[in-house]
Amino acid sequence: MAIINMSDLDLQGKRVLIREDLNVPVSNGVVTSDARLRASLPTIELALAKGAAVMVMSHLGRPTEGEYNPEYSMQPVVDYLAKALSCPVSLATDYLDGVDVAVGEVVVFENVRFNVGEGKNNEELSQKMAALCDVYVMDAFGTAHRAQASTHGVGMFAPIACAGPLLAQELDALGKALDNPARPMVAIVGGSKVSTKLTVLESLSGIVDQLVVGGGIANTFIAAAGYNVGKSLYEADLIDEAKRLVANAKSRGADIPVPTDVVVAGEFSPTAAATLKSVSEVADSEMIFDIGPDSAEALAKIIESAGTIVWNGPVGVFEFDQFGEGTKRIAQAIADSKAFSIAGGGDTLAAVDKYGIADKVSYISTGGGAFLEFLEGKELPAVAMLEKRGA
């Protein structure tokens, strides 16, 4: 990919505008989870160390476009960065017609979604943003799948458009996992519905050696294998689709294994009593909430022999401990594996945190929707823009 990297540029005395993903949860004016802010710090610090005057922009939440709403202000992010960085940090609320920023300073722009035209990638807005800088840095992988003014349009008009270190790392890791994977390649795809992950399943079933399905998705494959799933969440209208995916995988020597044992309950609740059963014994009144220990061990063996692991989604309702053993065993197997592993998606990251394996996963993706679209083989608009500008 012919993408210019920020780390290769001379930024001395330059006005550098960085698009980060600083969309963090805020309660009573205080940031409650700082993972994305911590991830962005090295990029901001590198720009400062290179002698730049730094401007940072991001969205936060989903305000009505074009309307200022204090609930979605970037002020809590500014407060956080002011403590984390050893330089002056301020908030610019009215910046489209020009902003004063000196070398060694950071100015954070107010929420980009307060601007009319952000979501529709408005050309006039994009040009105004581009006029503020000498160098535009796209560093927000989490929004790379959206063609918006702050993620795409501005980069088309800025004097120079480049990728920040965080985005570059993300693309390298995903490329390593998907473009030239060490074999065997194993993908674990969980989640509640086949329909929301159908394109991912299609794409991965064509490249992996083993495609492990979990959660509600697995229930549809269990039903497709001819077993009763009781009152479990599954999609009857996609059973033929599941059969087709299994047949496709088998035709190229790959596999989509179905659990042999499952953990069931009569209701979905934190106090529901868990019962272990063979997959062939699920009663009409029961719901499947996890894979059983035999299935978990079989999957762990598949993971142990893998060369590349892509993990997107838990295999059970791990929020309730009695239905979390399957996901816990898979997390442990990934942690113990010597394979190159990449994990992404909100529920997956929650599982990584819960089972304390963050430092054992080769790469943790910061993007939810962007991670999925990359797995689907789709072109990400922000990446396409950077390639065009780098050519």
From Swiss-Prot:
Task: Cite the EC number.
Answer: 2.7.2.3
Q: Which SUPFAM superfamilies match?
A: Phosphoglycerate kinase
Disulfide pattern: none
Please give the catalytic activity noted in the UniProt record. (2R)-3-phosphoglycerate + ATP = (2R)-3-phospho-glyceroyl phosphate + ADP
* Coiled coil location: none
Which Pfam families does the record cross-reference, listed alphabetically?
Answer: PGK (PF00162)
Which top class of enzyme applies to this chain?
Answer: transferase
Write out the residues that bind substrate.
Answer: 21-23, 36, 59-62, 113, 146
What does the UniProt entry say about where the protein is found? Cytoplasm
Q: Looking at the keywords, is Membrane present? A: no
UniProt-listed InterPro entries: Phosphoglycerate_kinase, Phosphoglycerate_kinase_CS, Phosphoglycerate_kinase_N, Phosphoglycerate_kinase_sf
- Annotated metabolic or biological route of this protein: Carbohydrate degradation; glycolysis; pyruvate from D-glyceraldehyde 3-phosphate: step 2/5
Respond yes or no to whether keyword Metal-binding is given for this record: no
Q: What residues does ATP bind to?
A: 197, 319, 345-348
Q: Which GO terms describe its cellular component?
A: cytosol
Which family would the database say this protein is a member of? Belongs to the phosphoglycerate kinase family.
State the HAMAP family in the record: Phosphoglyc_kinase
Question: What binding partners and quaternary form does the record give?
Answer: Monomer.
Q: Which PANTHER family match?
A: PHOSPHOGLYCERATE KINASE, PHOSPHOGLYCERATE KINASE 1, CHLOROPLASTIC-RELATED
Protein name from the UniProt record:
Phosphoglycerate kinase
